[in-house]
A protein has these predicted regions:
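Hydrophobic/aromatic-enriched cytosolic interaction surfaces used to assemble or bind macromolecules
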Residues: 1-167
């Protein structure tokens, strides 16, 4: 869950949280690095992050290069969490299940190319979640139109609301 100022890393097995940690790394840090590297405002850095992100073809890879130190830390932390799970899962949870995928949520999971970079770095499938997928079958209410990339910012809120509805 990549937020504005921090990222929560959560391992779920069979729908149950078995490990969680938070790191002080989020979209604001991406923007600060871009603003400093390109001498632009925070707003221009935010637009650069969303529109160019990790696209090596844009601006001769300069935006990618500016973001790389931060996304590399994120990849390292994810790798550390996966390793921790594999080292400790059997004694804590029985036979360990392999981590098959990394689901990205949070407003700053929208960093262009992040899922591709992380998939390559971790050698695990990474993808942007769809927080509204299957969220309300059989319920007589509607959710205002929301694009998938916008819904990522509300994944936690949607999950908490669904917990109350399904209870």
């Amino acid at each position: 869950d990549i937020g504005r100022t921090r990222t929560s890393l959560i391992v779920c097995i069979g729908g149950v949280i078995v490990f969680t940690t938070t790191i002080e790394l989020g979209g604001q840090l991406f923007e600060e690095h871009l603003a400093k590297a390109f001498h632009v405002s925070q707003e221009d850095a935010r637009l650069m992050k969303m529109q160019i992100g990790l696209d090596r073809k844009e601006r001769d890879g300069a935006v990618f290069d500016a973001l790389l130190p931060i996304v590399a830390v994120l990849a390292d932390e994810l790798s550390r969490v996966v390793g921790h799970y594999h080292r400790h899962a059997e004694h804590m949870h029985g036979a360990p299940e392999a981590i098959e995928a990394v689901m990205l949520v949070g407003g700053d999971a929208n960093l262009f190319g992040l899922e591709t970079y992380l998939s390559s770095a971790l050698q695990i499938r990474c993808f942007l979640a769809d927080p509204l997928s299957g969220a309300y079958p059989g319920h007589a209410f509607t959710i205002p139109p929301l694009r998938k990339n916008e819904a990522l910012a509300f994944a936690t809120t949607i999950g908490l609301a669904l917990r109350d509805i399904r209870a």
